[in-house]
Each structure stands twice: as structure tokens, then as C-alpha cells.
A protein has these predicted regions:
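A short acidic, amphipathic alpha-helical/loop segment
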Residues: 46-47, 75-79, 323-330, 353-360, ...
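Active-site environment of divalent metal-dependent phosphoester hydrolases
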Residues: 13, 68-73, 95-98, 317-320, ...
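N-terminal helicase ATP-binding lobe
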Residues: 1-3, 13, 48, 53-57, ...
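Conserved beta-strand hairpin/beta-sheet module of binuclear metal-dependent hydrolase folds
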Residues: 1-53, 285-319
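Active-site-proximal segments of catalytic enzyme domains
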Residues: 321-324, 339
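Active-site metal-binding motif and surrounding structural segment of the metallo-beta-lactamase
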Residues: 29, 42-91, 332-351, 363-366
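C-terminal regions of proteins
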Residues: 19, 345, 349-362, 367-406
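Flexible, acidic/histidine-containing loops and adjacent segments that form or flank the divalent-metal
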Residues: 2-4, 82-309, 389, 397-400, ...
Length: 406
């Protein structure tokens, strides 16, 4: 029987999670979701060193970064040391005009390092990791355009010895100049899951991006606004001038001053065995807190086999009904009912949460990756109280979590 295991590493105010699927004697499938911290960089370095030793420096089959704040990506360069390969790297895709809107709503300036990502995400990665990413397949994930459930019925237009996935038509020509990377750029169908498996055993990797109209308080006439943004970008591109001042003026008129209306992009990842039918040992978990040289390791042995999925949320906002509804409709009733482990959004911030959110997900395990000593004081008490009956576990500078065989 295949096993799915995962870790949440002790990196303080940040997130670094890894996992593997083992099927018999075949090489394990490895994934990583986020890799960064706003606490001491030494924490992420130590965590990656332990991860490397644990996995014998294995290549990563699937890398998913929720978004590009420092506390979620500061360890990527360390992770890719020693020529480690990334086989598939999922990149959230929004059209250029939307990316620049998002960047300025996040108060990212053209002289900030992150600005280059919003201009061209693949070129941004290539600049830093050219050698390591020569063979990487970049999977560009657009936001869904409808409210239907993400399907596992594939017409695999692309597959390899690791993953099967369905592609869609190219949505933009903006990456065509990356000639050496172009064969490895794939446009994912956002309505379909990625599948990994051998024989009858299948695991699904469901990816979800928030639609642009839910990311911010967008203008009523979005089509007219889009046209204005594109005109500004095109005119400045032809003159090789900086469009930022003109864009800022337009954004201020459309969105107002400040960023109180923004909801940052955060790519979700849902993982589970879709062929597992085992139902035994109803209940929650066996939990052991084991002292280690560099802190404590919390080891969880799941007991409830009705639930066998992990849901990563990154720093997602689920603080209003439209955001929550779009996510739950995309996952569907069956997937929602199978969530064993939920990574609670944004380190347990009350600003990303609404009352009763815990009951909607009803996980067996609620993971908060945070440093309560930081100025934000995550996780917030209101969120902890909401998740109190769903086995909340705080992963911080001193405690990491290992989930055994979901």
C-alpha cells in the first residue's frame, strides 16, 4: 500500500513543508510547498540541511510556491544548492496587466527585486537558477474562469514518468523569447488536477489560483480599466520609458490610496490518494512530542482513514464569502470532506480568517506555522479558538511536525 508522509519544518515566521509518496520499491515522489522565513535565516538553512540528509539530496518532483513574499521563498537558493534538480515548478499565471496591478497593490516598486518576477516570472527564476532549471518543466497555472469543480478526468496532453497533466492553449506570447526554455513551458488547464501514480494507485495534486476579480476591489467597468492599463504599458514599451507613474495615477483613481482592498495571490495545493478505500480506526490522531537536539519533533500517526488529504493555503485570504465560496466550489464536496491536514492561512492571522472557518474545513489537524514572538503576534487568539477542536499544532522556531502515513 502506498504511503503519503509530510513535514512542516521549524522555520519560525515562515513556511517550509515537504513530503513524499512511496509506492513499493519505486523511487519516492517528492514535493515542496514554500521555503522561507522572516525569522533567522539560520532556521531555514538548518531545516534544509536536515531535509537534505533525510531525503539523501533527492531531486524535487514538484515545487509549488504560494506567492513571493520573503517568508515563503527566502530558502529557495539554499534548497537548490549542490545542483539539485526541480522536475516540475508550478508558477501562478496572471496576464501582464493584472500582474502589474497586483504588484502595485502590494506596494512593490520597480527598483524592488520582486518587481522582476511580476514582469516575467520565468525569466526571474532563470536569472537566479539557470543551471539548475535547464531541465525543469515550468507549469503555468491560470486562474479558473468558471465555478465548476476541478476534475480528475484527464485527456493527458502532457505526461512523463512522474506526472500526468492536461494543458490548454497558450494564453500569451510573452515567454516566447526564452528560446532554450520554451519547450519546457506548459500552460496548465486550471480545471484539471495533476495525477501521479503507478497501476491502479493514483494521487491527485489539485492547484488553485484566486480569480483576479476576487483579489482586489476592482473597478466596476473592468474591461475599460484593462484597456487603459494595456495602453499605458504599450506606449511606454515603445518609448522604452517607465510606465509606473502613469499606472500609479490610474490605480489610485481606480482603487484609492493604500492597499486596504488588496488580497494577495496565494496558490493553493491539495494532495490526496484518490484510489484509497480504507476506512478503519475512526478517531483523530496518535500524537507524540519527541525531544531533539535542536528542539522538539511532533510526530502524528493518523487514525481516521476517512480523511486522507492535505490542503496548503499559503497566505491566502478566506475572510469573506466570495473567496471561500470560489475555493470550496473548485475543490468540491468530496475533497472538502477528505481534508485531514489543513495549513491554516497566513500563520493564523485574523485578517485572513472569518468566524466558523474551522468548521467549514473540519480538518483532523490544523497546522499553524508561525513565530508568536514576532510583532504580528501570529497566530491570533481568535483563530486559535476557532480551531481549538481541530487539533491545532503550532510549528515554530523550536517545533517541527512529521505526519506519518496519511
Amino acid at each position: 500500500m502506498p504511503t503519503l508522509q509530510c513535514e512542516f519544518w521549524n522555520v519560525g515566521q515562515g513556511l517550509f513543508s515537504s513530503g513524499r509518496i512511496q509506492m513499493g520499491d519505486a523511487p519516492a515522489f517528492h514535493w515542496v510547498y514554500d521555503c522561507g522565513t522572516n525569522s533567522s535565516q539560520k532556521l531555514i538553512q538548518n531545516a534544509i540541511q536536515e531535509y537534505n540528509q533525510q531525503e539523501n539530496n533527492a531531486d524535487i518532483d514538484l515545487l509549488v510556491l504560494s506567492h513571493f513574499d520573503r517568508d515563503h521563498i527566502s530558502g529557495i537558493k539554499e534548497l537548490l544548492k549542490n545542483r539539485r534538480k526541480i522536475k516540475h515548478w508550478v508558477v501562478p499565471y496572471y496576464p501582464l496587466w493584472q500582474r502589474l496591478v497586483i504588484a502595485l497593490l502590494l506596494d512593490i516598486q520597480p527598483d524592488d527585486e520582486e518587481w522582476a518576477f511580476y514582469q516575467n516570472p520565468i525569466q526571474y527564476f532563470k536569472t537566479y537558477f539557470a543551471e539548475e532549471l535547464k531541465e525543469t518543466k515550468f507549469l503555468l497555472l491560470p486562474a479558473k474562469k468558471n465555478e465548476s469543480e476541478i476534475s480528475i478526468s484527464l485527456n493527458p496532453s502532457s505526461f512523463d514518468d512522474v506526472l500526468s497533466f492536461e494543458t490548454t492553449e497558450k494564453l500569451s506570447n510573452e515567454f516566447d523569447n526564452l528560446e532554450q526554455l520554451e519547450p519546457n513551458v506548459h500552460w496548465l488547464n486550471p480545471d484539471k488536477a495533476l495525477l501521479f501514480g503507478k497501476g491502479e494507485e493514483q494521487f491527485e495534486f489539485v492547484l488553485y489560483n484566486v480569480p483576479f476579480h476576487l483579489l482586489a476591489k476592482v473597478p466596476t467597468n473592468l474591461t475599460a480599466f484593462q484597456k487603459q492599463v494595456k495602453q499605458i504599458i504599450q506606449s511606454h514599451q515603445s518609448n522604452s520609458t517607465d510606465p509606473t507613474p502613469a499606472l500609479k495615477t490610474l490605480y489610485t483613481l481606480a482603487f484609492g490610496n493604500g492597499s486596504k482592498h488588496k488580497n494577495i495571490i496565494s496558490q493553493y495545493l491539495y494532495i490526496r490518494n484518490i484510489t484509497s478505500t480504507a476506512v478503519w480506526g475512526l478517531g483523530n490522531n496518535y500524537i507524540y512530542d519527541i525531544p531533539k537536539n535542536d528542539g522538539n519533533e511532533i510526530i502524528v500517526f493518523p487514525k481516521d482513514r476517512n480523511k486522507n488529504a492535505i490542503l496548503y493555503t499559503g497566505d491566502a485570504f478566506l475572510n469573506d464569502l466570495p473567496l471561500l465560496t470560489d475555493l470550496t466550489q473548485s475543490l468540491g464536496v468530496e475533497r472538502m470532506a477528505r481534508i485531514y491536514c489543513l495549513q491554516v492561512p497566513h500563520h493564523g492571522s485574523k485578517h485572513n480568517w472569518q468566524q466558523g472557518l474551522a468548521n467549514i474545513f473540519s480538518p483532523c489537524l490544523s497546522v499553524f506555522s508561525a513565530d508568536s514572538q514576532r510583532r504580528n503576534g501570529h497566530p491570533h487568539s481568535e483563530v486559535l479558538k476557532d480551531f481549538a477542536t481541530y487539533t491545532p499544532i503550532l510549528v515554530n522556531k523550536n517545533k517541527r511536525l512529521f505526519i506519518h502515513s496519511i
